[in-house]
Curated annotation (Swiss-Prot):
The lineage of its organism: Archaea, Methanobacteriati, Methanobacteriota, Thermococci, Thermococcales. InterPro entries: Indolepyruvate_Fd_OxRdtase_bsu (IPR017719), IorB_Oxidoreductase (IPR052198), Pyrv/ketoisovalerate_OxRed_cat (IPR019752), Pyrv_flavodox_OxRed_cen (IPR002869). Keywords: Oxidoreductase. Optimum temperature is 70 degrees Celsius. NCBIfam families: IOR_beta, PRK06853.1-6. GO terms for molecular function: indolepyruvate ferredoxin oxidoreductase activity. Catalyzes the ferredoxin-dependent oxidative decarboxylation of arylpyruvates. This is Indolepyruvate oxidoreductase subunit IorB. Disulfide bonds: none annotated. The keyword Oxidoreductase applies. Its EC number is 1.2.7.8. It comes from Thermococcus kodakarensis (strain ATCC BAA-918 / JCM 12380 / KOD1) (Pyrococcus kodakaraensis (strain KOD1)).
């Protein structure tokens, strides 16, 4: 595999950089060349955050070029649209369905698009696929809303053609999280896997 590109986005405080590091470490342990990058200075709570994970046999530079992302993994729906130019034709947007309205929306200066409107933009304007589910609800079902990022990683692992196995990712989660949180993180991962399989018809 020459390269696989993931763009992870959302707002500060959602665990985006942790997710990027977990995926990068899993790819490294799987034997790939890995580059992980992030936009610095933007991770204050509720500020827009973007991280890049690139891995494969032929990967140079941490930044994913526009139009080259295989997947956009978004922790907040409208943030997926903010960075939609990164998605390649035929790529997949996996997003948490629960919104955190931007300041402009809260002030009444803009309207927040519906999930159906977002799906139309991704599929008709960018030739991608759009899938949204309430990852926060599943994280709470697992036992802790903080595991929303792990729910989304579980969903990502089911993406058609995704190069990393479930076990490769779970092993990194097990050795990365505090020991007392391993069980809740494993539950979160499995709930994300289940949700993705249902959406993808697997």
């Amino acid at each position: 595999m020459k390269e696989y590109n993931i763009v992870i986005t959302g707002v500060g405080g959602q665990g985006i950089l942790t997710a990027a590091n977990l995926l990068g470490w899993a790819a490294l342990r799987a034997g790939y060349k890995v580059r992980v990058g992030e936009v610095h200075g933007m991770s204050q709570r509720f500020g827009s955050v973007i991280a890049y994970v690139r891995f494969g046999e032929d990967v140079y530079g941490a930044m994913v070029p526009e139009g080259k992302a295989d997947v956009i993994l978004s922790f907040e729906p409208v943030e997926a649209l903010r960075y939609i130019n990164y998605l390649k034709k035929g790529g997949l947007v996996f997003t948490n369905a629960r919104p955190i309205p931007p300041v402009q929306v809260s002030m009444g200066l803009a309207t927040y698009p519906t999930l159906d409107e977002m799906k139309k933009i991704v599929e008709e304007d960018f030739g991608g696929k759009f899938m949204a589910f309430d990852a926060e609800k599943l994280a709470m079902e697992a036992g802790n809303i903080v595991t929303t990022n792990v729910v989304l990683i579980g969903a990502l692992s089911q993406t058609p053609g995704f190069p990393l196995s479930e076990e490769q990712i779970k092993e990194v989660i097990r050795i990365s999280v505090p020991p007392k949180t391993i069980d809740v993180n494993m539950r979160a991962f499995e709930l994300g896997v289940k949700a993705a399989k249902e959406m993808l018809g697997l």
